[in-house]
Design a protein with these regions (language model features):
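Generic N-terminal targeting/processing segments that precede catalytic cores or assembly contacts
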Residues: 4-61
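Phosphate-handling active-site elements
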Residues: 60-71, 100-116, 132, 153
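Short glycine/serine- and small hydrophobic-enriched flexible loop segments
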Residues: 51-61, 96-104, 143-150
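A structural-propensity feature for long, helix-poor, extended segments
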Residues: 107-152
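Non-transmembrane, aqueous-exposed alpha-helical and coiled segments at domain scale
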Residues: 5-16, 33, 65-72, 106, ...
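Conserved phosphate/anionic-ligand binding catalytic regions in large, soluble enzymes, centered on
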Residues: 39-49, 82-95
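A short glycine/serine-rich beta->alpha loop
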Residues: 36-41, 62-63, 76-86, 126-131
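Conserved small/polar residues in nucleotide/adenosyl-binding loops
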Residues: 159-161
């Protein structure tokens, strides 16, 4: 899945639209994702991800007119209460941290969004006390965050990251 992002400001409409598109991709590949997770874990991660995406989409009427920071905070709270367990706490931490560092209600460009994600991943890493190579979601999140961060540091356009 590739986010269809221009270099304009991101909005809650962007969050909702992409959550719906991600839901389709995840649902279409659920059995493959479950199989990969069974190789390194207990195979239930896909269900938590699907539940989390569904919760985000259900928030549409509540968050569509909110600032990005308030919308991300609503998402964090919904995920924390709706998923539960370690996945809920970790994904909730990701969105809560992104909400805290977004603090711009006028809009967020892709570089700010990337920095928000990078900070969120770092918070998840600290909370979960996990790193790359430990067969956790950090094996995906950290390399993605590093790649995005490197692209911003090199001042690459989003399409080139």
């Amino acid at each position: 899945y590739i986010f269809m992002v221009t270099e304009s400001l991101l909005s809650t409409d962007f969050l909702i639209k992409n959550a719906k598109e991600i839901q389709v991709v995840i649902d279409n590949n659920a059995s493959e994702i479950e199989k990969l997770d069974q190789e390194i874990g207990d195979g239930d991660h896909i269900f938590n991800v699907q539940r989390g995406i569904k919760l985000v989409i259900e928030l549409e009427p509540i968050i569509k007119h909110l600032s990005m920071s308030k919308a991300l905070n609503q998402i964090a709270m919904k995920i924390l209460s709706g998923i539960g367990g370690s996945s809920g706490a970790l994904f909730g931490t990701l969105f809560m941290t992104m909400a805290k560092v977004s603090n711009i209600d006028d809009g967020i460009d892709y570089k700010k969004a990337i920095n928000m994600f990078v900070d969120g991943v770092e918070a998840v890493k600290q909370r979960g006390k996990a790193d790359v190579g430990e067969k956790t979601m950090m094996d995906v999140l950290i390399p993605v965050a590093n790649c995005l961060k490197e692209g911003v540091e090199k001042d690459l356009s989003l399409i080139h990251i």
